[in-house]
Swiss-Prot record:
Keywords: Ribonucleoprotein, Ribosomal protein. One of its GO terms (biological process) is cytoplasmic translation. GO terms for cellular component: cytosolic large ribosomal subunit; cytosolic ribosome. One of its GO terms (molecular function) is structural constituent of ribosome. This is Large ribosomal subunit protein uL4. The gene is RpL4. InterPro entries: Ribos_uL4_C_dom, Ribosomal_uL4, Ribosomal_uL4_dom_sf, Ribosomal_uL4_euk/arc_CS, Ribosomal_uL4_euk/arch. The keyword Ribonucleoprotein applies. It comes from the Eukaryota.
Length: 401
């Protein structure tokens, strides 16, 4: 929860979803701690590995047969082969991981490094981040919890809930506080697991529901344990695996009044260290307000910032003037005149050849289409040149007498 959104007081709600009179609690400093999803995810992955049970294949697997290599000189692989004869099995490869009935490559051992050590301060940082994220409604809703009717976040209820001993009373309590919609989500999500887990007593899977954090168990655990999705935990034994299942922050947490009031003693504040954890100080956020858009648009920062640069840097296209005519004309404008002269000279030579050939063969030019076109082009060119000469002569000033 950012410092800008934190409230100084939190209301305590009764079993009937009514704010208790004169029972407002100061928001613990742990809810203002920085939220670090990266730390939570990393620590969760390490802690989850500590629950694994050691497994390995049998040391004798794949070696419970008599086999010996035939050696070299028989044009067959040197893999050990089963002894004997009179059966399909004799002569077949054995022992190797590429053989049928052989052992696996690098057989698994029970002395693998199953557990991972996590620094105490890192574990506490992840736990603090998960608690702080549970007080942000947007993060809780993004996790998939149905919290449309919940009155306030973080949700704190009176200690009378700890005395509930019947599941029927617990269901009534959840319905009154508008939490039952989240339990219905759990009911709808119940399904059979895909894979081998169905044969290993892990048949059904479902979504997670709310987490109830209490201080003293006076029947609360037995009352809530038969409701799907709901989990309970003591405030002194807060666990990251329950506060951030899957390594994702935003679990919906219901706090009892006494458990909520105990958070300052457990994690301390920024003015005094924790009284229950030796030498632990609550991590401070590097930014008091995490709304970057609001900060960058503020007048104080805008006065210091310089105006944006509006220069446009265009990349220069490197063109070869020997192959690109436009680039050649750009570098040497007279090249256009030379090219035009060369084209005219070539056309003139072509016309001369056609005329000479027609004269030699006594062919009339009117009947020859190419010669006719060439003569017309020559005539048009002569007209254009004459018109240009007239324009140039008209522009020249008349000579004085």
């Amino acid at each position: 929860m950012s410092l800008g959104n934190a409230r100084p007081l939190v209301s305590v709600y009764t079993e009937k979803n009514e704010p208790a009179k004169d029972k407002n609690i100061c928001l613990p400093a742990v809810f203002k701690a920085p939220i670090r999803p990266d730390v939570v995810n990393e620590v969760h992955q390490l802690l989850r590995r500590n629950n694994r049970q050691a497994y390995a294949v049998s040391e004798l697997a794949g070696h419970q047969t008599s086999a010996e290599s035939w050696g070299t000189g028989r044009a067959v692989a040197r893999i050990p082969r089963v002894r004997g004869g009179g059966t399909h099995r004799s002569g077949q490869g054995a022992f190797g991981n590429m053989c049928r009935g052989g052992r696996m490559f690098a057989p698994t051992k029970t002395f693998r490094r199953w557990h991972r050590k996590v620094n105490v301060n890192q574990r506490r940082y992840a736990l603090v981040s998960a608690i702080a994220a549970s007080g942000v409604p947007a993060l809780v809703q993004s996790k998939g919890h149905v919290i449309d009717g919940v009155s306030e976040f973080p949700l704190v209820v009176s200690d009378e809930v700890q005395k509930v001993q019947k599941t029927k009373q617990a269901v009534i309590f959840l319905r009154r506080l508008k939490i039952w919609a989240d339990i219905q989500k759990v009911y709808k999500s119940q399904r059979f697991r895909a894979g081998r887990g169905t044969m290993r007593d892990r048949r059904r899977i479902a979504r997670r529901g709310p987490l109830v954090v209490y201080d003293k168990d006076e029947g609360l655990r037995k009352a809530f344990r038969n409701i799907p999705g709901i989990e309970t935990i003591n405030v002194d034994k807060l666990n990251l695996l329950k506060l951030a299942p899957g390594g994702h922050v935003g679990r919906f947490v219901i706090w009892t009044e006494s458990a909520f009031a105990r958070l300052n003693d457990l994690f301390g504040t920024w003015k005094k260290p924790s009284t229950l954890k030796k030498g632990y100080n609550l991590p401070q956020p590097k930014m008091a307000n995490t709304d970057l858009s609001r900060l960058l648009k503020s007048e104080e920062i805008r006065k210091v910032l310089r105006d944006p640069r509006k220069r446009v840097f265009r990349s220069v296209r490197r063109l070869n003037p020997l192959t690109n005519v436009r680039q050649l004309i750009k570098l040497n404008p007279y090249a256009e005149v030379l090219k035009r002269r060369a084209a005219l000279a070539a056309e003139k030579r072509t016309v001369a050849k056609v005329l000479a050939k027609a004269k030699k063969q006594n062919v009339e030019l009117a009947k020859s289409h190419f010669a006719n076109v060439a003569t017309k082009a020559a005539a048009n060119r002569a007209k254009l040149l004459a018109a240009r000469k007239k324009k140039v002569a008209a522009k020249k000033p008349a000579a004085k007498k």
